[in-house]
């Protein structure tokens, strides 16, 4: 009986402690951005890693979970390196056109061989799908739990669980995961963090380095010409290599084209206006 009573308490403490991502939450004045945001629905959160304070757009959306799509390449890359599924970020896979026939929406950059690093950069889904048989389902379960990654739900052997809304995560949880990663490494070896960052570095501006990943999918999985949802998730480091901010933007728009570039553009504009860049 004591064990039965104790476990829920421990679980509650674990979840509540991890959920305390922000010391304070301050709404961002969206007036300067409304004209360009237009009909898009936006949830944004940035966490100041020095103060623990958050600034947000649409606080009500912070805890709403959505499929991570290709933002899952952040934890997936780390899991891949930790489990030895590849020897390094430079390990190359050949594109199997029979196993992964090109679809109409595929960019040309997917239709070729890739390394883990280039697959991350170009968001080549097939490479990460080919990693699934190399990673024991017990390892996925272990690392999703270590990362407190959303609902931690997946079907063993599935190479679509991060794309078909089985696995879900909220903007708040995305930022909590990034915070864990850059503050305590979340159980990941320092060498694997460094290898990941070599692939995840997007750009350096004004001595600030940006590490991030996009993700997107159609709201109706049977209609790629309709409304889309998308992410841009990552963190910033200053010129000394110290992490300064973690952020996540979730966006819904009338089409993929409407959010393809804008999710990053708006994120960088907000981070700049808030003094992080």
Each language-model region and where it sits:
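Beta-lactamase-like hydrolase cores
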Residues: 19-64
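Active-site-adjacent helix/loop patches that line small-molecule binding or acyl-intermediate pockets
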Residues: 21-31, 95-100, 104-187
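Sec-dependent signal peptide recognition
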Residues: 2-8
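Short glycine/serine- and small hydrophobic-enriched flexible loop segments
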Residues: 78-86, 133, 176-183, 272
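Short, well-structured active-site flanking segments
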Residues: 82-99, 188-192
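Active-site SXXK
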Residues: 66-90, 119, 247
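Structured C-terminal helix/loop/strand segments within mature extracytoplasmic catalytic/sensor domains
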Residues: 20-34, 65, 133-138, 182-277
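N-terminal signal peptide c-region/cleavage motif recognized by signal peptidases
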Residues: 14-16
